[in-house]
Design a protein with these regions (language model features):
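Alpha-helical transmembrane segments and immediately membrane-proximal extracytoplasmic
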Residues: 2-588
Length: 588
């Protein structure tokens, strides 16, 4: 019997299998330190010709480094998608065929950050120390420190900048998973690629698109005139809101709970307003709208992602040539997404005809660009007019149902790789856009109260509008990048792996649905939360595969964390305000 040479999907270890068929073992490696599932080993019979030494389309195929994820191989994705499995599966005997351990196996002893990024513990410690040093030293060179003011004011400004950095750090650790979690979970990006990409885009978005005008009373939750003339109390309240929201975000990030940063700030503001301004200091109608988003956001996200994923399975997976169907659907999806986003979020003119023309032009340009890239990378595979019956029989599984919501068996082999390559590329594009937009939007949750507090310290008006300096915008962007680098992998693990198993098609469906819902619901004035919407969208993809494909314990933990976010933020804010007012009474 001739031994077959095979590469393991875990750390590229090689071993021999004395079988008549070639098998590709599946391992669920514990990339994330807080992942509780045991290492799972299964086997899936493959045909030897599928493992060709020369890939036909190296850039878009999921086995390439651009779309390789250490959780699973393409074969395990295929099985997870619902493709027809072999009825007589022969399991590999673990006692006969043991994998030789190498020095790389000592990774389990590394701390969380080192294990997540596959780096040494000394490198992880060096990165953390450098970030901490920069966080402590950079404020000394910022104009917003209050050059020319008294030493006491400079010390308070320094403490305020550190509080803003702490909040931004926790936003990066928790909220950036909204953009990159599904891409990592599906294998479209590795964790290291996702963090590096998000770091550049988050900082760019915060610096280039971050709002330059903010309200002292964030999100219209508090009545502004209640605190007119009470600058010291207002300063303490703003500082306590940053500290309280940051504390709860850090707790949530430690356990991998994706919570809304907006809700954290709202809860902190509500606690401060109730304790020091009374019941009349809170806009209760605005608070009710925020609470209603707990239900509206995940439901809308789940519904849209459910339909998008079913649409993909119905019109791409069931096509005679799924690869060509995916390549044809990609430009359409890009056109719809870019046109809608350009028209709703970035109109260059208030004139409806001009804004619509701009959106259509950008959508067309995006569709043409994506179509050219896909056609160029997939090459002759997509130029073939039709596939032979033998190829179709080998590449796809016949469908027995034709209903839109019916369960459809998907493609296999080369066709599956083409589909995943196309949707993986589209998912990376959508993740990049969401990351850039997130940096420009959510950085205000940290730098809004920060800029208002600095304005009070420097003798500015404590009115309703505060101008945000450019160095404060950059400071908030740096905080987001720092939090993403050190702790971002925790919530990414929850979004990408712990709710339901994701593939490029599922990840794209979830991300496309979440972005669409957030965009249009915001324009319609509906209360919406990007975090809640994305979690709901990931759940919707799981529901599309069956109720058993959603991990209920994870969903239960997430929902509980949502419910307690505002109360916990309020309690912490009251506590911190009391502490800060006592300290300020001695300093000022």
């Amino acid at each position: 019997m001739t031994p077959s040479y095979c590469l393991s999907s875990t750390r590229n270890r090689a071993f021999f299998l004395h079988n008549t068929h070639l098998y590709l073992p599946k391992y669920r490696s514990l990339l994330f330190p807080n992942e509780t599932q045991l290492l799972k080993r299964e086997s899936l019979p493959l045909k030897p010709q599928l493992l060709s030494p020369k890939p036909c389309f190296p850039t878009l195929r999921p086995k390439n480094s651009k779309f390789t994820h250490p959780f699973a191989s393409i074969s395990s994705f295929a099985e997870a998608e619902g493709e027809e499995e072999h009825k007589e599966e022969i399991k590999v005997n673990e006692h006969r065929h043991k994998v030789v351990k190498t020095k790389e196996g000592d990774e389990d002893d590394l701390p969380g950050m080192a294990q997540a990024f596959h780096i040494s513990s000394s490198t992880a410690s060096a990165i953390s120390i450098c970030i901490a040093f920069m966080a402590l030293s950079l404020p000394l060179f910022m104009k917003s420190l209050g050059q020319g003011l008294s030493l006491k004011t400079k010390m308070l400004s320094y403490a305020t900048l550190l509080s803003g950095f702490y909040m931004a750090w926790n936003i990066g650790a928790n909220d950036v998973a909204n953009a990159m979690g599904t891409s990592v979970g599906s294998g479209a990006l590795t964790l290291r690629q996702a963090v590096l990409t998000a770091a550049v885009l988050e900082f760019s978005g915060a610096l280039l698109m971050g709002t330059h005008v903010t309200s002292t009373m964030q999100k219209g939750i508090l009545v502004a005139n209640i605190f007119q003339g009470k600058d010291t109390l207002l300063f303490a309240g703003l500082l306590s809101s940053l500290a309280a929201a940051g504390t709860w975000l850090q707790v949530a990030s430690y356990y991998g709970w994706p919570v809304s940063t907006t809700h954290c700030i709202v809860g902190s503001m509500v606690g401060f307003g109730l304790a020091y301004g009374g019941v009349g200091a809170v806009f209760w109608s605005s608070l009710a709208r925020v609470i209603s988003s707990w239900v509206i956001s995940p439901l809308m996200g789940a519904l849209v992602s459910f339909l998008v994923y079913k649409f993909i399975r119905r019109f791409v997976y069931s096509a005679p040539n799924p690869g060509q169907a995916a390549a044809a659907a990609a430009p359409v999806a890009v056109f719809a997404g870019v046109t809608g986003i350009s028209f709703a979020a970035f109109p260059l003119s208030k004139s409806f005809p001009l804004a619509l023309t701009q959106a259509l032009a950008l959508g067309t340009a995006g569709a043409v660009l994506v179509n050219r890239i896909i056609r160029k990378q997939l090459g002759h595979l997509l130029l073939q007019p039709t596939a032979s019956q033998a190829q179709l029989k080998e590449g796809t599984v016949p469908n027995k149902n034709i209903g839109f919501l019916s369960d459809i068996a998907g493609p296999k082999g080369t066709q599956l790789e083409i589909v995943y390559g196309v949707f993986g590329y589209m998912q990376v594009l959508s993740a990049c856009f969401m990351s850039f937009a997130h940096g420009g939007n959510d950085v205000s949750n940290a730098i809004g109260p920060l800029a208002a507090a600095l304005s009070i310290l420097h003798g500015g008006a404590s009115g309703t509008e505060i101008v945000i300096p450019i160095d404060v915008l950059a400071w908030g962007g740096f905080g987001i990048v720092a939090g993403l680098t050190i702790w971002g992998y925790r919530v990414i693990a929850t979004i990408g792996k712990k709710i339901t198993e994701l593939t490029p098609t599922r990840g794209f469906a979830a991300e496309f649905a979440a972005a669409s819902v957030v965009l249009f619901a915001s324009k319609l004035g509906l209360p919406i939360s990007a975090t809640h919407t994305l979690v709901g969208a990931v759940m919707g993809v799981g529901f599309a595969r069956g109720l058993n494909n959603v991990r209920r314990e994870t969903v239960k933990e997430i929902v509980i964390s949502w419910a307690v976010t505002i109360p916990v933020g309020a309690i912490l804010s009251v506590l911190y305000t009391w502490i800060f007012t006592k300290l300020l009474s001695y300093i000022l």
